[in-house]
């Protein structure tokens, strides 16, 4: 009977440690690094740069609910501007941009254009 209790306690302890470890590993693959005026600045891991769902979640977290919002995304923190206007290099390094206007209901996520994208396509150039 005592061995069963020890086994149950050990199993619970192991399950708790594993749950805590998996939570620590499941860190978001983006970070809100600041703002310039009303523009929110977010860095994403390169592998997440084209993940629309993740980018929308990051934008929702960075924006104030019910307010107009622009979120600019980079995959390299070294390219995030510290002032406006941003340089051409910083602008080219942007991987996505999210825009929300709650008055009109407009909401748009533009991803970086793939090379060879048609000129009229809706993407971040």
Task: Indicate where each model-derived feature is located.
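Mature extracytoplasmic domains of secretory-pathway proteins
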Residues: 39, 43-97
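Bacterial N-terminal signal peptides that target proteins for export
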Residues: 1-14
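Generic preference for hydrophobic/aromatic residues in regular secondary structure cores
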Residues: 2, 32, 71, 96-101
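C-terminal partner/receptor-binding element of secreted or periplasmic proteins
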Residues: 90-125
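N-terminal signal peptide c-region/cleavage motif recognized by signal peptidases
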Residues: 21-22
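Short N-terminal segments immediately surrounding and downstream of signal-peptide cleavage
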Residues: 26-43
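Intrinsic disorder/low-complexity detector
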Residues: 5-6, 78, 103
């Amino acid at each position: 009977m005592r061995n069963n209790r020890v086994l149950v306690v050990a199993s619970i302890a192991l399950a708790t440690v594993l749950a805590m470890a998996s939570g620590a590993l499941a860190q978001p693959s983006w970070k809100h690094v600041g703002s310039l005026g009303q523009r929110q600045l977010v860095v994403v891991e390169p592998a997440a740069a084209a993940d629309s769902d993740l980018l929308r979640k990051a934008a929702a977290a960075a924006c104030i609910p019910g307010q107009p919002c622009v979120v600019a995304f980079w995959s390299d923190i070294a390219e995030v501007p510290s002032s406006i206007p941003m340089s051409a290099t910083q602008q080219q390094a942007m991987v996505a941009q999210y825009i929300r206007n709650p008055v009109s209901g407009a909401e748009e996520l533009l991803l970086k254009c793939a090379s060879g994208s048609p000129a009229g396509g809706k993407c971040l150039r």
